[in-house]
Design a protein with these regions (language model features):
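Extended redox/cofactor-interaction regions of prokaryotic respiratory oxidoreductases
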Residues: 2-146, 155, 161, 254-399
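Long, contiguous, secondary-structure-rich segments that constitute the structural scaffold
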Residues: 182-183, 188, 192-248, 374-390, ...
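Short, contiguous, well-ordered secondary-structure segments
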Residues: 166-170, 176-177, 361, 369-372, ...
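Short, well-ordered alpha-helical packing segments
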Residues: 116-120, 144-147, 151, 182, ...
């Protein structure tokens, strides 16, 4: 912003439906009435302590503690804390956990070994501490084994999807674009697209948005929802080919909209007018175009703020100003991190572990492992069927290592034993590996001796969802104190060369698969 390189040629440019001022976004809603819809969107932007999701006693309302004093601006929620909090009964106990394609007993959780224990541990009456789990997945993932009720989903090739301007579209800086997926393969098993299942459940539960006045289901399935749902008058999930097929952004329902998208290659783009391409937050031409397309209700120009008033409000609350004040044990932290001007500070983990654990360790997911699905693809398995720990040349020399050797990698929380590979184009004090390539035996319809299950591994075992015990009786989440983002990249480790075990460690008991091992060869019925 200071350099003037935002929304200019050659600089950072917003992609429609952005830019938008934070003030026109919803605030988080959390007031629950039995047998009634939530009072508004559950996620949103907070502008001060008055927007926090707290009860009358100041306790977090959400199971993940999002929008609480622990992480006030947690617009994405804290998925990594849900199971841990439910297990601890903090802020309360739950009777049912309902998740969609979140592999929380494996690669999507911190402290994977501990989370698996939380999912199976029983109380002194012999009941599960987390009594019931409902789960939907397209494959037999590690999480399936822990579910009481499974809703089998379809793959991307077997269902409709909507990549909408109302959500996370495929836009570029010069155009507002959305897209669909549509079935090209007939499912050969008893499965339904999860979106269609949600539409069905909405009608069965008599949710107002899913039933007609006579109580009948409003939508046949998700395809019908994509075409006929209106978020506002004349604005639906898809912006293209509305009305008679010529309207874009705003327009009546077009019963042939899906067919029009398919004919157009599955996407639609509305190009930003030449005179509207730059300075979008202050450009009248862009503002008018965005209103016409339905991105805004009214022109919504705004200026960039280097000084954040919402953050200063939280800092003031920590200083004792205002009606809603944070608990005593969080005041000092909020004073520090809620600076209204940009600041940098080292993490507590970095400060505490500089000596014994001197190396930074990162894990990131390859694109093919979105929801871990890449292990279902024969040619991708040849490319990344296992994942070594990538180690920089300096550490390889310091520890007398060569590619193919094994190391014991330890954090303050746990240890793993894994193979290494040299990577010269890497920060000399950082090691890393891919996430989600390592699989648990019995999952994903893979052979128990597959390389994913014997040589693949997770760095997650080293990362706890809680910070080290401070001796103050509080559970400090291993998350950013402002946004609640999981602190995956704060991990510090040490390593030592070791002899090669039969397979990477830790190794877990094979889970019982509901689908068995995948066939050697397969065939599909393809839609033409």
């Amino acid at each position: 912003i200071i350099l003037g390189t935002v929304e200019v040629p050659g600089g950072f440019r917003f992609k429609p439906p952005y830019p938008k001022p934070s003030s026109i976004h919803p605030k988080p809603h959390f007031k629950v009435t039995p047998n009634a819809p939530l009072d508004g969107p559950h996620l949103g932007f907070v502008h001060g302590p008055e927007d926090l999701a707290l009860d009358d006693q100041g306790n977090p309302v959400r199971i993940d503690k999002a929008f609480s004093w622990e992480n006030p601006m947690s617009a994405h929620g804290l998925m990594h804390m849900v199971i841990s909090n439910a297990y601890a009964g903090d802020p309360y106990k739950i009777d049912t956990l309902f998740m969609y394609m979140a592999n929380m007993s494996w690669n999507s959780s911190m402290n994977t070994s501990g989370v698996m224990e939380m999912l199976t541990e029983k109380d002194n009456k012999g009941d599960y501490i987390i009594p019931r789990i409902i789960y939907s997945d397209a494959y037999s993932s590690e999480m399936v084994a822990y579910a009481d009720l499974i809703l089998p989903d379809t793959t991307y090739l077997e269902r409709h999807d909507c990549i909408s301007l109302l959500d996370r579209p495929i836009s570029e800086a010069d155009g507002a674009a959305d897209a669909i997926r549509w079935p090209v393969i007939e499912p050969d098993r008893d499965v339904r697209g999860f979106q269609s299942v949600l539409v069905d459940l909405g009608a069965r539960l008599d949710l107002p948005g899913f039933i007609n006045e006579d109580g009948s289901p409003k939508y046949r399935d998700y395809e019908d929802y994509i075409v006929n749902h209106l978020r506002k008058p004349d604005i639906g999930p898809l912006a293209g080919f509305r009305g008679d097929g010529s309207a874009e952004g705003r327009g009546p329902v077009n019963p042939k909209q899906i067919e029009a998208y398919i004919e157009n290659g599955g996407f639609y783009v509305s190009h930003v007018p030449e005179e509207a391409k730059y300075f979008k937050p202050w450009n009248n031409a862009y503002q008018d175009w965005a209103v016409e397309l339905g991105l805004y209700d009214n022109p919504s120009p705004y200026i960039f703020n280097l000084y954040s008033e919402p953050m200063r409000k939280f800092q003031l609350a920590a200083e004792g100003v205002g009606e809603r004040l944070p608990p005593e044990h969080l005041k000092d932290r909020l004073k520090k991190v809620m600076s209204p001007l940009p600041i940098w500070y080292s993490t507590e983990i970095d400060n505490e572990e500089k000596g014994e654990y001197p190396i930074h360790a990162l894990t990131q997911r390859p694109m093919a492992m979105y929801h871990s699905w890449g292990s279902q693809n024969a040619w991708l398995r040849q490319i990344h069927g296992l994942n070594p720990l990538y180690v920089p040349t300096k550490i390889m020399r310091d520890y007398n290592l060569k590619t193919g050797d094994w190391v014991k990698l330890s954090s303050i929380h746990n240890s793993i034993t894994v193979p290494v590979a040299e990577m010269s184009s890497l920060n000399e004090n950082t090691v890393w590996t891919w996430n989600a390539i390592g699989k648990r035996k019995g999952a994903w319809a893979l052979d128990p001796n597959a390389p994913e299950a014997t040589k693949g591994f997770l760095l997650n075992h080293l990362i706890h969802e809680l910070q080290p015990n401070k001796g103050d009786g509080h559970r400090w989440s291993n998350s950013d104190p402002v946004t609640g983002q999981a602190a995956w990249f704060d991990l510090k480790v040490k390593l030592e060369k070791t002899t090669a075990p039969r397979e990477s460690q830790p190794s877990f008991e094979e889970i019982k698969s509901p689908v068995g091992v995948g066939p050697k060869s397969i065939s599909w019925k393809v839609r033409v």
